[in-house]
C-alpha cells in the first residue's frame, strides 16, 4: 500500500511534505518560528511531530518523545537580537562623594532572555566581576543589577564597563560610563585678615586661595556677621578677595569654599573694630616737687 501524505507539525503549524523522487524522501522547506525556542520547554526546543498516512488510512505518528527518533524531532531556533544594557547609576560625568558607590544597571532581552551568568562589570583596568558578587533581581525580560566595589575607589576619574549576553549566545554591545569620585573637600587658606585682629579701620579686605584637584571649579562665599553669604570671583590660580565694611565691636567673617561635588571647607575669622581713642582720666606725680636727682613715680589712669 502506498503512502498518501506525510505531514510535519511544528509550533502549531502543519506542513504537508512533498515526495522527492531523487532523494526518495518527503521534504519541505519551512520558515522557522520567529522567536527563540529557548523558553519553549526545559530542553529549549520546539517539538516536531511527523504524521504519515497511507492510502488505506493507516496513520503512524512520531514525535520528540520517541525512543529512536525523538532527538531528531527537536527543532532549536536561535534569535539574533542581542540584549540591551542601560546603566542607571552613576550617570556620565557624575561627581560622587561616596568612594564605594552602589553601581546600578539593567539588562533586558525580550526573546531568549538574559543569561545571568554572562552579566559582568569591569572597573577601570581591573578584572571583570561576575557571578554572585553582582546582585541580580529578576524583572520582566531581564535583570536589575547592583554592584558595590569591595575596595574603596580612589579620588579621581573612573570608568565602568558592563557586558552581558542572552541565552542564545548573542553578546550585548558593551556599555560604559565615566565618572569621578571626590571625597576630599577643597583646600581653603584665608591670608587676610588674621584671626583676632583689632583695627581702627572699618574697611577690611578678605583675601585667600582655594583649590580642588578633583572637582574644580570651586565657588567661594564670604559672609559678615549675620548678613548674606556673597559669592566672590575666584581666579584661575584659586585666589580671591572681598572688600567688607566692619561694624563697631566684634565681627565674624565666614568664608566657605565649595567644590563641584558639593563638599565644602569653612574658615572663620574674628576681627574687632575699635575707633574710640583711649581716655586719660588722671595723672599723678609722686612726690611733686621732687629733689633734683631723686626718683619719682608717675601714675596715669587710662580707660578704653
What is the meaning of each model-derived region?
Residues 1-4, 109-116, 211-220, 304:
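Extracellular acidic loop/turn motifs
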Residues 93-99, 195-202, 288-294:
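Short, solvent-exposed loop/linker segments at the N-terminal edge
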Residues 12-22, 32, 130-136, 229-236:
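Short, surface-exposed loop motifs enriched in S/T, G, D/E and P with embedded aromatic residues
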Residues 32-45, 150-156, 243-250:
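Surface-exposed, short loops/turns at beta-strand junctions within beta-sandwich domains
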Residues 21-34, 137-147, 236-241:
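Aromatic sugar-binding surface patches on proteins
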Residues 54, 66-86, 176-186, 269-278:
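Flexible, low-complexity linkers/stalks enriched in Thr/Pro that connect modular domains
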Amino acid at each position: 500500500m502506498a503512502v498518501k501524505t506525510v505531514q510535519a507539525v511544528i509550533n502549531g503549524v502543519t506542513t504537508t511534505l512533498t515526495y522527492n523522487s531523487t532523494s526518495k524522501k518527503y521534504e519541505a522547506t519551512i520558515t522557522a518560528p520567529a522567536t527563540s525556542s529557548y523558553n519553549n520547554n526545559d530542553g529549549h526546543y520546539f517539538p516536531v511531530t511527523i504524521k504519515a498516512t497511507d492510502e488505506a488510512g493507516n496513520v503512524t505518528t512520531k514525535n520528540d518523545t520517541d525512543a529512536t527518533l525523538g532527538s531528531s524531532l527537536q527543532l532549536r531556533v536561535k534569535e539574533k537580537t542581542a540584549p540591551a544594557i542601560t546603566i542607571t547609576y552613576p550617570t556620565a560625568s557624575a561627581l560622587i562623594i561616596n568612594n564605594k558607590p552602589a553601581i546600578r544597571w539593567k539588562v533586558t532581552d525580550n526573546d531568549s532572555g538574559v543569561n545571568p551568568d554572562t552579566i559582568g562589570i569591569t572597573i577601570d583596568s581591573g578584572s571583570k566581576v561576575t557571578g554572585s558578587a553582582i546582585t541580580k533581581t529578576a524583572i520582566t525580560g531581564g535583570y536589575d543589577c547592583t554592584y558595590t566595589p569591595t575596595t574603596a575607589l580612589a579620588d579621581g576619574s573612573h570608568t565602568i564597563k558592563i557586558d552581558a549576553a542572552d541565552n542564545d549566545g548573542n553578546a550585548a554591545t558593551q556599555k560604559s560610563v565615566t565618572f569621578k569620585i571626590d571625597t576630599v573637600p577643597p583646600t581653603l587658606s584665608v591670608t587676610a585678615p588674621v584671626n583676632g585682629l583689632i583695627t581702627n579701620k572699618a574697611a577690611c579686605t578678605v583675601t585667600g586661595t582655594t583649590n580642588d584637584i578633583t572637582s574644580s571649579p570651586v565657588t567661594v562665599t564670604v559672609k559678615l556677621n549675620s548678613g548674606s553669604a556673597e559669592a566672590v570671583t575666584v581666579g584661575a590660580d584659586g585666589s580671591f578677595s572681598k572688600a567688607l565694611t566692619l561694624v563697631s565691636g566684634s565681627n565674624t567673617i565666614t568664608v566657605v569654599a565649595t567644590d563641584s561635588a558639593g563638599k565644602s571647607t569653612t574658615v572663620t575669622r574674628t576681627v574687632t573694630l575699635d575707633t574710640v581713642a583711649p581716655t586719660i582720666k588722671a595723672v599723678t606725680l609722686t612726690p611733686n616737687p621732687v629733689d633734683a636727682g631723686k626718683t619719682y613715680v608717675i601714675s596715669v589712669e587710662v580707660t578704653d
